């Protein structure tokens, strides 16, 4: 793991910021959060006013990205982005980059790309990279973790413009985004998952590819949040195994973090 991000609305954000402050060698950024997807573990916006469009009927953030795209007022989105970044900075974080929880600000559910342009604009204000792929390959379009709802023609018609805009405001971003999926036999056993990841990494194209995981230790708290807790435990096990690093090295993959990316894209 070379980079990570922190969710400002969540209760353990302060501890994570203190870790980042004590370990500046790690590239840790802000995971812009506009969805609250778990049934019983939920959170609300950081902002204390003008957040009505960002909340569901219970006052929490919307559970799904499509709800954000359909309901969010763009001025309230902008204010909440600033609030989350500034909250984590106040808690001790010097952010290395921005990314977005569940892709709720990408516009890929309904084609509301004004949200993505807003994020890029604010990332430029802070001088931070943002996780958004420079192009969309067929593998990305069909990736169930990315869960893109609009057609490739529509997204490709705008991605060039959005990336040109990102570069114009000084925002670095990876070339590709390709996370592992859980829709096949890799969900059945740890060995299957390991073999799947090892094969997936052989398919990475030339350039900067970001893949992401959600590693966690097995505990009652994790099991209380999600029924798919085993996936996160397997991710922790696999990516703490020295053999995985050896496999990555054998493929000629060079690991970088978001600070490296920012320097590369200057």
Question: Model-flagged regions — what are they?
Answer:
Residues 1-39:
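Active-site beta->alpha N-cap acidic-glycine motif
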Residues 2-5, 25-31, 95-99, 129-131, ...:
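Structural preference for beta-strand elements that scaffold enzyme active sites
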Residues 7-9, 31-37, 103, 135-138, ...:
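Active-site beta-loop-alpha junctions enriched in small/polar residues
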Residues 13-27, 42-56, 89-92, 162-170, ...:
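Acidic (Asp/Glu)-rich catalytic clusters
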Residues 25-27, 31-82:
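Substrate-binding cleft of extracellular glycoside hydrolase catalytic domains
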Residues 74, 80-167, 187-190, 202:
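Catalytic domains of cell-wall/extracellular-matrix polysaccharide-remodeling enzymes
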Residues 130, 225-266:
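C-terminal domain-boundary segment and adjacent tail
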Residues 163-195:
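Active-site rim beta-loop-alpha module in soluble metabolic enzymes
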